[in-house]
Amino acid sequence: MKATSALYKSLLADKNHATEIKAVIAGREYGQDRIASCCVTGGLFAESGWSIGGAVARELQLKLAPLGDIPRMGEIRLYLRLTLGGRASEWLPAGVFYIDTRAEEAVSHMLTLHGYDAMLKAEAVWLDPTQDAGEWPMAMRTAVNRIAARMGVEVDPRTSILPYTVEYPNDYTMREALGFIAAAHGGNFIITDAGRLLLHTTAALPAETNFLVESETGRAILLGEVRLLV
């Protein structure tokens, strides 16, 4: 969960609010005036649906008017905030992505960037022969820390790893190893909006409810003081 201000919560509760996005690429900030479209896909589960034992990546499709050269495989940091009637909330991180492909329109020179989050950095074989292989079996907590370091990301402090061990991985990729560790905990690894590696377990999901709720805020719909059931 993101820590948000009272203003953000107030704006979110108003169905008339708007969402504003910005992107920071190579030190340059792109606001709504430069961004034509933005789409992020992916989440807690793989495309096949509800599952555990995954290391799930998100994808970004961003179309913008470039302010200058954009480096290949450059980093894109997305942010969002809520606005309404001259009021604006704080900017919240909305993902960190790395450019995979680009396409420029011949006439408008608009640039469409496609990228993935840092999870794709885990596609490399885990054991690097130039580094100390460590002792096996290895504690899963140690394994996660080492893989995160190889990926160049931090481990989210909310990640809780049980005192299990992982066997020698042979030629498994880091992503496959993360999937094995995630399965042992009944969850999936993801990259958070802040760019950290997080083990999200089914135990961390919100409690199921049969209340009829508002699509925007998730609040229960009341008839007088009675909550409606579905």
Residue ranges of predicted features:
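Assembly/oligomerization scaffold segments
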Residues: 1-134, 178-186, 212, 217-219, ...
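Short acidic/polar beta-strand-loop edge motifs in secreted extracellular
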Residues: 47-49, 121-144, 155-180, 203-211
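Hydrophobic residues embedded in beta-strands of well-ordered beta-sheets
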Residues: 109-111, 195-198
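Short, well-structured beta-strand/strand-turn elements
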Residues: 151-160, 184-196
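Internal metal/ion-chelating core segments
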Residues: 176-188, 196-197, 201-203
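A compositionally biased, intrinsically disordered/low-complexity signal enriched
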Residues: 205, 220-221
